[in-house]
UniProtKB/Swiss-Prot annotation:
InterPro entries: Alpha_tubulin, Tub_FtsZ_C, Tubulin, Tubulin/FtsZ-like_C, Tubulin/FtsZ_2-layer-sand-dom, Tubulin/FtsZ_GTPase_sf, Tubulin_C, Tubulin_CS. Dimer of alpha and beta chains. A typical microtubule is a hollow water-filled tube with an outer diameter of 25 nm and an inner diameter of 15 nM. Alpha-beta heterodimers associate head-to-tail to form protofilaments running lengthwise along the microtubule wall with the beta-tubulin subunit facing the microtubule plus end conferring a structural polarity. Microtubules usually have 13 protofilaments but different protofilament numbers can be found in some organisms and specialized cells. It catalyses: GTP + H2O = GDP + phosphate + H(+). Keywords: Acetylation, Cytoplasm, Cytoskeleton, GTP-binding, Hydrolase, Magnesium, Metal-binding, Microtubule, Nucleotide-binding. The lineage of its organism: Eukaryota, Discoba, Euglenozoa, Kinetoplastea, Metakinetoplastina. SMART domains: Tubulin, Tubulin_C. One of its GO terms (biological process) is microtubule-based process. The modification N6-acetyllysine is found at residue 40. Its cofactor is Mg(2+). This is Tubulin alpha chain. SUPFAM superfamilies: Tubulin C-terminal domain-like (SSF55307), Tubulin nucleotide-binding domain-like (SSF52490). Tubulin is the major constituent of microtubules, a cylinder consisting of laterally associated linear protofilaments composed of alpha- and beta-tubulin heterodimers. Microtubules grow by the addition of GTP-tubulin dimers to the microtubule end, where a stabilizing cap forms. Below the cap, tubulin dimers are in GDP-bound state, owing to GTPase activity of alpha-tubulin.
């Protein structure tokens, strides 16, 4: 078996986790108490869901997941919520006092006390696996726990499980909507560590997903639940090949191989289609070519950045439902002819496609329509540098006055870490610039050397 362990860190990670596990259970016909009704004969022919669930002797299915937060309220919601019987109590770990939006508290003072316990639980889950593929880490980098403890945990996982791939679903601060003043500090410090210790990081941003739900689902004031359910669909599409059978299955490590041209350039854009409400879906065709075009629209991106401003380096399209390879090839051929979708000149093919026959499942009473087919795109584009540029700019404004820095230094951080992290991100922006640069001018220089 190729198992994957999910790690949900901090408030964002745990709440996204709730939405994801709700969806995974629905997709596999697992009830909130972990039982799988006997009339569901799915389990007989298809046990691929064991990548995400482990089966106990009593026939209960337990998610291979850990929820951790430095303060109890969010994890308590899981402990008392609909799915309280699904998780093993030891998998829900909470501390007493929170990180207070402070990276240093999450990484040094408070996080340090809880991290060994977390690793111990993760070790237990890993021992239950026959062939662990890797970890899916869900967190946000704007707060204290997700950024600080998230970075600390990833560093420790790199040491303990060096060769296993680590995929991050990372919520980055939005351009306009902010939940904390010190977001830029936390993000820069955390990204400094993510550069080293994650293999692929899918960037999400609340504002982009707000706009998407508001525009496409006609929800005037989307709540976090609406957003998380949409993120859940994306995560589900990306991991569908691990959990179901299909024509073209895609493995965790395959993402890495196909999306990451250079180790540092591993921050990817995601988008999903069709995001459509039930009233509209009734009147639309939603053919393969339509949904394939939709995922390339700047408006469907889950991060506020315009892919038209950059070039694509690689792109995975994960189809699910009633889709045949012939349609996919036709759709991809059309996309390649479009002028708006530009690839870097050193990546001529650039597309990886996956097809999964399981149609997308929707949460009953949710906002998304039940559709026959859906596609999720995960792409590596140089446009994502916009996100870093934006955060770096805000960081510089605050750091030039050393505002709020004493809170971090007081928790045992050194001021040098700020400048070190900031320099690392400046180098990252430079890397993106160079990758997107025309390689034609480089040929000219090489000719000079030869003659």
């Amino acid at each position: 078996m190729r198992e994957a362990i999910c790690i949900h860190i901090g408030q964002a990670g745990c709440q996204v986790g709730n939405a994801c596990w709700e969806l995974f259970c629905l997709e596999h016909g697992i009830q909130p108490d972990g039982a799988m009704p006997s009339d569901k004969t799915i389990g007989v022919e298809d046990d691929a869901f064991n990548t995400f669930f482990s089966e106990t002797g009593a026939g209960k299915h337990v998610p291979r997941a850990v929820f951790l937060d430095l303060e109890p309220t969010v994890v308590d919601e899981v402990r008392t919520g609909t799915y309280r019987q699904l998780f093993h109590p030891e998998q829900l770990i909470s501390g007493k006092e929170d990180a207070a939006n402070n990276y240093a508290r999450g990484h040094y003072t408070i996080g340090k006390e809880i991290v060994d316990l977390c690793l111990d639980r993760i070790r237990k889950l890993a021992d239950n696996c026959t062939g662990l593929q890797g970890f899916l880490v869900y967190h946000a980098v704007g707060g204290g726990t997700g950024s600080g403890l998230g970075a600390l945990l990833l560093e420790r996982l790199s040491v303990d499980y060096g060769k296993k791939s680590k995929l991050g679903y990372t919520v980055y601060p939005s351009p306009q909507v902010s939940t904390a003043v010190v977001e830029p500090y936390n993000s820069v410090l955390s990204t400094h560590s993510l550069l080293e210790h994650t293999d692929v990081a899918a960037m999400l941003d609340n504002e982009a997903i707000y706009d998407l739900t508001r525009r496409n689902l006609d929800i005037e004031r989307p709540t976090y639940t609406n957003l998380n359910r949409l993120i859940g669909q994306v995560v589900s599409s990306l991991t569908a090949s691990l959990r179901f059978d299909g024509a073209l299955n895609v493995d965790l490590t395959e993402f890495q191989t196909n999306l990451v041209p250079y180790p540092r350039i591993h921050f990817v854009l995601t988008s999903y289609a069709p995001v459509i409400s039930a009233e509209k879906a009734y009147h639309e065709q939603l053919s393969v070519s339509e949904i394939s075009n939709a995922v390339f629209e700047p408006a469907s991106m889950m991060t506020k950045c315009d892919p038209r401003h950059g070039k694509y380096m690689a792109c995975c399209l994960m189809y699910r439902g009633d889709v045949v390879p012939k349609d996919v090839n036709a759709a991809v051929a059309t996309i390649k002819t479009k002028r708006t979708i530009q690839f870097v000149d050193w990546s001529p093919t650039g597309f990886k496609c996956g097809i999964n026959y399981q149609p997308p499942t929707v949460v009953p009473g949710g906002d998304l329509a039940k559709v026959q087919r859906a596609v999720c795109m995960i792409a590596n584009s140089t446009a994502i540098a916009e996100v870093f540029a934006r955060i770096d700019h805000k960081f510089d404004l605050m750091y030039s006055k050393r505002a709020f820095v004493h809170w971090y230094v007081g928790e045992g951080m050194e001021e040098g870490e700020f400048s070190e992290a900031r320099e690392d991100l400046a180098a990252l922006e430079k890397d993106y610039e160079e990758v997107g640069a025309e390689s034609a001018d480089m040929d000219g220089e090489e000719d000079v050397e030869e003659y």
